[in-house]
UniProtKB/Swiss-Prot annotation:
Biased composition regions of type Low complexity, renumbered to the chain: 272-292
Origin superkingdom: Viruses
Gene that this sequence comes from: E2
Species the sequence originates in: Pygmy chimpanzee papillomavirus type 1 (PCPV-1)
Region (DNA-binding domain): 293-377
Name of the molecule in the record: Regulatory protein E2
């Protein structure tokens, strides 16, 4: 017991020295977490030996020491990866490398220089909440640390990694808890941003200049902007929409980057008739065998995770699949899950197998194989 007490005293003495030093060096904070880890190992062992006190020190239950030890291991190993990155020489405070800060939204990221954002629900100053907008956020993507800036808009607080936008505070979700009218205003940096009556999560329609089919378009910003992806609500739409007047536009799903414009109703109706005939003929041929359908992989998971994963697929593995849909959801379903879906299509089953053999699908995303009984291409 005396040996255990000496080791514990030495460990706690080193912790006190680190606290007093209040260093800005990352190596010192790594040393701090090593000491915390060692301290909890000693306390865990003391409890196993049946000790309730070591001198004046109360020995906590096994579960407490085990949990704190695991936290210390996690922080030590994570900070060691930061030290090896280009940000290892930056000044870091003890608070910025604390476990509490590690779990502060956005979770499992390091944050610096927080600023307060006030959100007034129902546009009432007495019904307001305060959130922290971080000037710098350190995100680990594919085992590589990236330093990005925190940003705010009417929808929430977010950061961008490449072209992938991640919201860590969603004002619409918060409004469902704190607001009666689902309206709010954001007060930040001497500016006030008012919300619409309802915030739509879909991408705005594409605006067309002129009646021709290849006019210049202006695209609204999407949560994850990938040039070959369709808008969020277009996946389950039929090949053409029936329009009610001239100079309207319909999207053509066969190629998501193209726009089809109809200058009169007759032109579009005739195209619909031809397309429907081809669709029925294709269905009759495909019903004979599943293998004649288009091979697909259907990904299911959190909407934002799917968008980020889809962005990486286009960036690194676009040769291993043919098309990727936007994120979509089943409607009129008794299933209350909020998981989104992304559908990938392939030239043949061999390309799909090559994709599965090469690409590591995250554990948070479920995938199923299948065939489409209608022609998308």
């Amino acid at each position: 017991m005396e040996t255990l007490a000496k080791h514990l005293d030495a460990c706690q003495e080193q912790l006190l020295e680190l606290y007093e030093e209040n260093s800005n060096e990352l190596t010192k904070h790594i040393q701090h977490w090593k000491c915390v880890r060692h301290e909890n190992v000693l306390l865990y062992k003391a409890r196993q030996m049946g000790l309730s006190h070591i001198g004046l020190q109360v020995v906590p239950p096994l579960k407490v020491s085990q949990t704190k030890g695991h936290e210390a291991i996690e922080m030590q190993m994570t900070l060691e990866t930061v030290l090896k990155s280009e940000y290892g020489t930056e000044p870091w405070t003890l608070q910025e490398t604390s476990f509490e800060m590690w779990l502060t939204p956005p979770k499992h990221c390091f944050k610096k220089q927080g600023q307060t954002v006030e959100v007034r629900y129902d546009c009432n100053a007495e019904n307001s909440m305060h959130y922290v907008l971080w000037k710098y956020i350190y995100v680990c993507e594919n085992d590589r640390w990236q330093k990005v800036k925190g940003m705010v808009d009417i929808k929430g607080l977010y950061y961008m990694v490449g072209q992938c936008k991640t919201y860590y505070i969603d004002f619409e979700k918060e409004a469902k808890q704190y607001s009666k009218t689902l309206q709010w205003e954001v007060c930040y940096d001497s500016k006030v941003i008012c919300s619409p009556a309802s915030v739509s999560s879909t991408v705005q329609e594409v605006s067309i200049a002129g009646p021709t089919s290849h006019s210049t378009t202006t695209l609204a910003q999407a949560t994850c902007a990938v040039s070959s992806i369709a808008t969020e609500d277009s996946v389950q739409a039929p090949p053409y929409k029936r329009l009610r007047g001239p100079s309207h536009c319909a999207r053509k799903l066969q190629n998501t980057s193209n726009i089809v414009c109809a200058t009169d109703r007759g032109t579009l109706d005739s195209e619909n008739n031809i397309n429907n005939n081809n669709y029925n003929n294709n269905n009759q041929q495909r019903n004979n065998s599943n293998s004649s359908g288009t091979p697909i992989v259907q990904l299911q998971g959190d909407s934002n995770n799917l968008k980020c994963f889809r962005y990486r697929l286009h960036d690194k593995y676009k040769h291993l699949f043919m098309l990727a849909s936007s994120t979509w959801h089943w409607t009129a379903s008794s299933n209350s899950t909020k998981n989104a879906i992304v559908t990938l299509t392939y030239v043949n089953e061999q390309q799909r197998q090559d994709f599965l053999n090469t690409v590591k699908i995250p554990a948070t995303i479920k995938h199923t194989l299948g065939f489409m009984s209608f022609q998308l291409l």
